[in-house]
Amino acid sequence: MLQNYHIYVINIMLTEKDLKQIAERGISEKQVEAQLKQIAEGFPFLKLEAAASTEKGILAPSNDEKAQDIKAWDNYKAEGHKVVKFVPASGAASRMFKNMFAFADADYDVPTTDFEKKFFDHIRNFAFKKELCNKCKENEGKDIKTLMADGEYKAIAKNMLEAKGLNYGQLPKGLLLFHNYEDEPRTAMEEHLVEAALYASSNGEANVHFTVSHEHLPLFKAKVAEKEEKYAEKYGVKYNISLSEQKHSTDTIAANIDNTPFRNEDG
């Protein structure tokens, strides 16, 4: 009875426009129904048996075993086998910054939660600190240190998240400055190019395939093209880089707090 009622509620919630958008993405009504049902019921935590360790699942090869494994891999590549580094890169960074989005919209102006306090206490350590500081100077006329001294923490958060600044709230995670080095920071995408050159190249060529979301494809292509030559020259390899889009049929519906489908202003 409850299941039939749930199906009835789903049916009356979906408009003709909803059904059209769902069909265009290759998603069935039953899939949407199942997604909303799971959102309503919640996602149970997995019950862990124990922490992973060398006694439970983690391998700890000896130095001799490591050397043998490396030799076997190098021999495999030397035989002319094609190696492709596959990188799922369609994830958006919005979830990474959900706490900072909440702070930007909060009814208080200074860091209050433990997360907010830690974020600003360690902001100097982030790989994107220099770029963020430059955006703050450009948009606010002050650097990060001065903004913090003046209590303008939200200005820093907004310059990190919004399009006027770094736009990190909307970028794919692969294009965020992720690691800091003495000479310069690198995005996650750049690190994959480096890794491909170091351990996945064969006969002087490194093959890399990125999967990205449709909306990020042009920017991702541009950023890859911008960095490809630099790392090809640095590591002495020729890159063969391809990109594909994640299928819309893998999308999950967004829901409001009352479990009704979330819609933009245009429906």
Question: Each predicted region: which residue ranges?
Answer:
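Domain-scale recognition of functional cores that engage charged ligands
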Residues: 22, 44-267
